Amino acid sequence: MNSISIKKHFAFLLFFAFVLVGCAGGGDDIIETSESSSASLSNFSFKKADNADMSTSSTGVTSGNLIYITVPEDINLKSIVPSFSIPKGATATINGQPVESSYTPCDFTSTTKIVVTSQNGKAAKSYTILAKNGDPVIDGLVYSFMLKHDVPGVSVAISKDEETVYKGGYGFAVVDSEQRVTPQTLFRLASMSKQQTTLAIMNLYEAGLLDINANVFGKGGILEQQFGTNVQANVDKVTVKHLLQHTGGWASDPIYISASTTLDQRIADMVQNKALKYAPGSTYDYSNFGFCVLGKIIEVVSGKDYETYLKETVHKKAGISNIFVGKNDLLERRSNECQYYGQGGKNAYGNNVELSKAAGGMIASTEELMKLMAYIDYGTKVPDMFKKETLDMMYTPLENVVNTSGNSYKKYAMGWRTEYPNYPDWATFHGGTLAGVATIWARSNDNVNGVVLCNSRSYDTSSDMDADMWHMLEDIQAMF
């Protein structure tokens, strides 16, 4: 290339560069920047620095788009400043009103929605804030338990010296409608129903209407008229006491099988056609069937249906009215009852809780259960509904009984578990298990009693939900 061509080429490049600069017109106006489409929210809290009446900060516990948070009892949730992190350029609103982190006071007295909109306006994400007053330490234990075991709703109550000292509702009683759990929310009790049955039996006993050592079946038995005298060998030796202690002798349990037969038909089949595996009174083998028979005894002896007798006697004595027999169908759920959520492919509405009412079909609130506990705990502030001798009989551990492995067994009384080495502070207690249900209540040796009710149950084999729930209750009781 000759020198003239080089000069022409250089001149062309120089001219082209000037044209580009001229078209840019200062540069910033036409350079396109990429705006963020992120719409996340994190680090939600109520900081002491942002709220003058708070002595300590409260941090939210997040599960997906759901955030649980507790502030002390004396903090007004109607006007509290939240702190949170959102992407640069994104905006947040509550009820359509803009909210700035660490600046805007908001009302969190009810379920609150925070909507985060991305910088470019193309994405928005909603977060649900469930704020409540309470003890952040106690509630933190409950939140951790809920997240670990995927439980939508939990209710907890604690009493000390026969007075309720703490109660709280956590999460949703009904997820779809976002109905919140309260201490008045009704939950299925599952096997905690057995204590309702036990108390009804104790009431009949104290009224002189029932002998604990009376035979149940066969000639002269309490239920002779209902089930005749043609019973299997030794069935006529089964007593009320044996049924209360799970030592009736049956190895099979027909209560939670899928069948259209009535309770009377199932009882008749068991006593007339199913041989006992163990001698009555000799061997502990947990039996829902036995407690359903006790429910039948209550109705026959009292002349009233099971729920009516409980309400007119045991519950009336305790001044409570919010305990009922539950319903099988979701559509028949009471207005203040939670919905139950199965896990692991389990159907939370697959069990016949109406048939099994005396063994596992009752519903109640934590608030009512703590009131009831005050009448059966040997306390001095609230008069017990039974004589000390009756309570002693009900709470005395098994004697001269073995388990199905042939080892001495003393961990059950009459309708109550007792003497568990892992829970030395608990005098008596009982839990409950059904699909969609996990429950526990405990009477402690120092009269700090407690109850936990859940509307779901995890079947994850990598963790023990019951052990976690029991330890959580024990830890909460230890704070009082």
Located regions from the model:
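Catalytic loop of the DD-peptidase/beta-lactamase superfamily, centered on the K-T-G motif
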Residues: 25-30, 134-168, 311, 316, ...
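Short active-site loop at a secondary-structure junction
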Residues: 149-155, 168, 177-242, 278-287, ...
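Catalytic-site signature segments of enzymes, centered on catalytic residues
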Residues: 231, 252-331, 356-370
